[in-house]
A protein has these predicted regions:
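Catalytic grooves of carbohydrate-active enzymes
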Residues: 185-228
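His/Asp/Glu-enriched short active-site or ligand-binding loop at hydrolase and phosphoryl-transfer sites
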Residues: 145-186, 220-232
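Short, well-ordered secondary-structure micro-motifs
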Residues: 88, 113-115, 149-152, 173-175, ...
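Active-site beta->alpha N-cap acidic-glycine motif
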Residues: 23-112, 118, 125, 129, ...
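Charged helix-capping and loop-helix junction motifs
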Residues: 92, 116-123, 175-181, 206-210
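N-terminal membrane-anchoring alpha-helices
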Residues: 1-39
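Short histidine/acidic/glycine/proline-rich micro-motifs that form metal-
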Residues: 79-84, 107-110, 145, 167-170, ...
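CE4/NodB-like, metal-dependent polysaccharide N-deacetylase domain
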Residues: 65-74, 78, 99-100, 106, ...
Length: 233
């Protein structure tokens, strides 16, 4: 999820309110701050990518996979190494069903808070657990923020850094209707949708997913996994 940038208790409350009310505003601000990452798909085709962070989760990941099967679409799952070690069968199921996997850290410490050595060790530990991936190798920072030095380390290890362009901030567990509204408002050619399948109660995300998919189809958009849309570094 995108981290809340605040230094005081009052600032945290204000920032959370901003996330809930104006998701696209926050996204635009972060795009200015982080130019060396992938925010959307550069394509002339009417494609979008749907991604899920923080999993796998034994309750919500299977429900999401069932919905994806029902609509015959492929997604990208940014996995946490520690959770892959706990639920290896879910990682295998994600791969077996043809989805793309990416690295979302090993233990979900906020990426921006790690020093370079800690970050590199965490990255490689997660990579070992998640397993080798065909290029491109994809990384999404835990907490949604990352330092320039960390981006350089990712490039050293042949990773592309991916954030996204359509957020619902579902870690805060907004209502299902809000998730549908926030994501559908960002549905356009090249959008990268960011949702979460772990880290808390994700039932509203699961329930919103069919409407999001159907709204994308009504807009003439088709879903692709990121491995088919992003070139390897």
């Amino acid at each position: 999820m995108i981290a809340v940038i605040a230094l005081t208790a009052t600032g945290v409350v204000s920032a959370v309110g901003l996330l809930i009310c104006w998701p696209q505003v926050i996204t635009l601000v972060l795009r200015v701050l982080f130019r060396n990452v992938i925010w959307d798909i550069r394509s002339s085709d009417r494609v979008v990518a749907i991604t899920f962070d923080d999993g796998p989760d034994p309750t919500f990941t299977p429900q999401i996979l069932e919905t994806l099967r029902r609509y015959n679409i492929k997604a990208t799952f940014f996995l946490v190494g520690e959770r892959v070690r706990r639920f290896p069968e879910l990682c295998e199921q994600i791969r077996d069903e043809g989805h793309c996997v990416g690295n979302h850290s090993d233990s979900w410490h906020r990426t921006v808070q790690l020093n370079n050595d800690e970050f590199e060790s965490d990255l490689l530990r997660a990579e070992q657990s998640i397993g080798s991936c065909a290029p491109p190798k994809l990384f999404r920072p835990a907490g949604g923020l990352i330092r320039t030095a960390q981006i350089r380390l990712l490039w050293k290890h042949k990773y592309s850094v991916v954030l996204g362009s359509a957020y619902a901030f579902d870690p805060y567990r907004p209502p299902k209707k809000y998730i549908e509204w926030a994501i559908s408002g960002g549905l356009k050619r090249g959008a990268i949708i960011v949702l979460h399948d772990s880290g808390g109660d994700r039932s509203n995300t699961v329930d919103a997913l069919p409407v999001i998919i159907e709204n994308a189809h009504k807009a003439g958009l088709r879903f692709e996994k990121l491995s088919e849309c992003i070139h390897a570094r």
